[in-house]
């Protein structure tokens, strides 16, 4: 037999149904976040050689800062990060931000200024490192830890800077005329709009202010009227020819027109075209070939044309007419009488070329540059008197000053592309030529040439990721700082100060803190399961600062656009008001350096598909014809069919195969990660697929994770990239394993500066952001050989390195006594008994002991008026034990607070001092379990302020922590010793020693026996003759000592951190956190779902024996309603059921063979069966080469059910499902006879039975159920608060009042509106009455009525309550004032 391979059982093997080979590697799924932030910080770049981007660019743009007089200057040299004070884990525990101190090197230059000449000479240069606040660091998983919680910065989609042409779709004007507009959007700075109005005059607006004629803007740029006309129009020359005029023949301008009079050749005088004929391109070409040069024209032909140049008498300087004036019966004689016999006119025919700019110029009141500048100044700063200097300065600052206006590289690139310019992308301000080009193109659009832009095209929208958002925020902080620095530089004696004294880093640090703490894009990470983490990091939001708002966003922005293909998922988006505004990045998509989303394609060369992959953005892709990934190819890579379905410029079309330039790399490149995890996605309706993607993110990690039988092949990718499953950083051998850590001795990538040991700490029962449980379990055993990238530990919701969000359940589709009406789900008791859908949730409770005005609060066991029974779970420090079972009302941490009281007499004080009576002056403020939560205490953390004495419990926790650290250090030390001494023996062996430990004979040749006579620590004393080898030994020794001291130093640092007190919020002396784990079994009211949007609520849990059962006696686990399928069109769930049934059947078959083999049969049938299932196909396992032990391992793994992968859009088809069912020896219909569990009779018809992957969603009835007795009231209205978190009541709304009114239930209604709600006096009386055993009550005036009276009074209405009940005397009495 060929060389045998072994299978270690640490990964799940799947039968792969995909037919299309994967050419491109899928990029790391959280690359978006990590790459962006790395580019911003550039920690690893050398200080001198950092490129101008990210943080470096921010500093470069703000510095140098000069003082107002120019006598000193502060320059930026470089920046560096120091090591963070606390690591990730410590920050999580202590509620700190994981950040590194930023040190910036600044140089202060002081000049001497010569008073007479004003020349500068350098007087002094000082350099200094200045601390500029802490910069948050990203964890390995792409998150930030801010105040102890994990947060994600979501990428934002916004409109790309550049120029956009658009029209109003005919909405602005009643005639429905299209009004075109252009808008230049910079990255930062003023917007410039250029737009037509209904009269076809072109206007400009700056920053959406009042409009000015565009010609004023052009004049402000330094052009005069003639120059403006010259730029936008060509001219024709009319020459006087006897009585008439001679005009050049221009075929292009005449195309398609009808002649109104005969066309006469000016040279020969013959008629070349009669009147009333249409001028076709062919006819014009013939005339040109005949040599027609000029035509005859009359005075009438001249009328209506416009002058191209001023008509000036050069001798006297008199201007008869100006450029742009119309020639008519009055003006023509003036020109002729002045003796002009050549008249240049503008080529405006009102058909192909309109007179818009000329009309604007004549309507413009401003005559010259000064008027235009003043006009712009008045628009921008109304009410200020303009001067030439201030107007010029302001106009230049608007668009031409790099500090105020920045197009950014993207903006410049987009502008070049749209306007056909060729300007380097370092020119980031506008130029005169840009503005002219924009106006030109706008006028052409109005003339019917060119297309408007589609703002929803992904070529016009770009992504701002973490790095860029942070960069903008930090720039704001630095600019705030700059003002303060300038003032300080001017106000103090500059010669004596250092850079440190000028800088106050608070504004910069505050900007960072504000961004991470309260920006709309900095979000609390969705951490229900690994998939929700990954999806959150890949999210693209159109909301946020500088983006859209929900209310303003229309339908177009939210809609799926053809350019989304392969870039943004068309399926995964929230339902509700954010639909389409929050999207997810597609699986293969990546963001390029300009912020545009790119998608990969395979190149096609000479009609053959190659494996070269290119990434293209939406703009670049429009040029090509792109074939789909599932196009049929021949063996040599050419297309089988003559015509191929392809995409081109946003349209799907059939094109000849020779025209195709690119091809998709994979069918799943158009969907997001969550959608790519849905098998048979292609058979589901899109709306249900959307729900399926969204609900997978809400699946709670279960106690026992189980990978799906029917997967898509994406599961291992998600588990690895999310960081839930731990992958080995480098190859090696497992040295130690326990539940909390794995120690691997590295055998590859051995770098002398790094330790040769990898220690992987596993998270045990940690609380996630959503209170689910994060727990990692090792998969390896001591001695295992590990390769780089192998999965060595499973995390939450992972199983053998596969994502496992739910469990495979045996499902029957049939109605069952109405218990699955309307999507309800019927479950078997087995599911509860075997903990199939049991999950662990961890709640965190924290209590603080503060320093109050009346004295400090105290955490203690000594609580007044509490029975010993209630204290049974507390230790002597008053803190609950780990492992205690707690229920609602139990004390977790005992705490007493001093309470104020009346001043004491001196005698009382004396007695109090003698007898130390305590109970009267403190009250019990202990932390108790909230209603409705039962659980087990799994962890307690105690934090003390610096200098506060630690209690017994805190000391114990500290000791435990230090022991753990010591163990880590000792293990690493042991492996280091073992490695180093093994290398030392190899170096010494075979050499002759010239010196050695005490009692060693010189000149002996060293062997293992000789060396082992001495203790290890003395081996270093051997000296050998070979000098080179001796040098190596000494180098080894130095390296060993350094590693050892580094280990010890790290240990000491950690211990010091543990022993040192903690940073606490002001006024807090001590803080205790208690973590309680709650085991939640599934129960009626919990929400469950499949992966196809098939969701429902558990309606009943039925005893196992009552559930329907199969012929072999197996009871089904779940009964679903078949009516949930047809109307919702998610047929994928049925295909999954059949395929899951086949997988389980196949598993049973393999299990039976495995048992036979164990009982002594031959292994060959087992090997053949496994090979026939898993070994076939393009990604098959090499079963034939596996040794027997591996086959047994594989059989054990597959006996519950064979795992298969059916990738989206390239998965199993009906024939494959049938084949699998046949292989497993099951009916091809996928239906079985079922028996009623209660009567034992068969059901009338065959029922579809199979395995579906079911998820338990994070909508548990325990978290929702809630009942209020007496609770908090709202301050103003005195009505009960609402919601479970506030322990609120239920709203009795308007409609409910109508219902009681309809029933005439007057007393019930009165009770609802008064004593049960906001009649303050009444509700206390009712309470007293109930205590007395009396059940009558009297309703008073509701507080909300008083609020109404107060509001009316505040409007100036005098409202009083009068009692109209007449007493005996006959006078009316005044009621007490309602509002008092």
From Swiss-Prot:
It comes from the Bacteria. Its EC number is 2.7.7.6. Belongs to the RNA polymerase beta chain family. One of its GO terms (biological process) is DNA-templated transcription. Transmembrane segments: none annotated. Gene3D superfamilies: 2.40.50.100, 2.40.50.150, 3.90.1100.10, DNA-directed RNA polymerase, beta subunit, external 1 domain, DNA-directed RNA polymerase, subunit 2, domain 6, RNA polymerase alpha subunit dimerisation domain, RNA polymerase Rpb2, domain 2. It comes from Rhizobium meliloti (strain 1021). One of its GO terms (molecular function) is DNA-directed RNA polymerase activity. This is DNA-directed RNA polymerase subunit beta. The gene is rpoB. DNA-dependent RNA polymerase catalyzes the transcription of DNA into RNA using the four ribonucleoside triphosphates as substrates. InterPro entries: DNA-dir_RNA_pol_bsu_ext_1_sf, DNA-dir_RNA_pol_bsu_external_1, DNA-dir_RNA_pol_su2, DNA-dir_RNAP_su2_dom, DNA-dir_RNAP_su2_hyb_sf, RNA_pol_bsu_bac, RNA_pol_bsu_CS, RNA_pol_bsu_protrusion. The RNAP catalytic core consists of 2 alpha, 1 beta, 1 beta' and 1 omega subunit. When a sigma factor is associated with the core the holoenzyme is formed, which can initiate transcription. The keyword Nucleotidyltransferase applies. It catalyses: RNA(n) + a ribonucleoside 5'-triphosphate = RNA(n+1) + diphosphate. Keywords: DNA-directed RNA polymerase, Nucleotidyltransferase, Transcription, Transferase. GO terms for cellular component: DNA-directed RNA polymerase complex.
